């Protein structure tokens, strides 16, 4: 069984008799010498859908649940649901909007590298690629000669995501966004 420091976002863990899907991990180091790092894991209970916070020291052993990942593509939205299709057997997986709301900020019909997380044969979440290409829908006009400065400006994408980009980037530009940090990486 892995230690808390080895658990990543998207892992399924067992805690207090509940199966939890790790949605976010926050690492804090208490003051003082040799203080063990504390891992605060924001999770979703897979049976009730409730949000649960768990805290572990870096050397605590965490029980993981066996899970499978399958490559999928985003198909379409149907009301309050998002439908993803398996790349191999073309089966469809449906998620409620509130279950994948944060992930949908990075997903459009062209997004490649999405994986679905299956626990006991049922779909419990999505794993995004480390970076995605998105087209800027709206940003302030670019300023001539601004490439020498390191100033940034907000850019909005069709999904509703807002990211700080360099001043020389314009509306309609295709850019690469880091999905974990929600930051601009480069032009596509």
UniProtKB/Swiss-Prot annotation:
SMART domains per the UniProt record, alphabetical: EFP, Elong-fact-P_C
Highest taxon above the source species: Bacteria
Organism: Vibrio parahaemolyticus serotype O3:K6 (strain RIMD 2210633)
GO molecular function: translation elongation factor activity
GO terms for cellular component: cytoplasm
Stored PANTHER family: ELONGATION FACTOR P, TRANSLATION ELONGATION FACTOR KOW-LIKE DOMAIN-CONTAINING PROTEIN
GO BP annotations listed: peptide biosynthetic process
Protein name (database record): Elongation factor P-like protein
Taxonomic lineage of the native organism: Bacteria, Pseudomonadati, Pseudomonadota, Gammaproteobacteria, Vibrionales
InterPro entries named among the record's database cross-references: Elong-fact-P_C (IPR015365), NA-bd_OB-fold (IPR012340), Rib_uL2_dom2 (IPR014722), Transl_elong_fac_P/YeiP (IPR020599), Transl_elong_KOW-like (IPR013185), Transl_elong_p-like_YeiP (IPR011897), Transl_elong_P/YeiP_cen (IPR001059), Transl_elong_P/YeiP_CS (IPR013852)
UniProt record similarity statement: Belongs to the elongation factor P family.
Record Gene3D superfamilies: 2.30.30.30, Nucleic acid-binding proteins
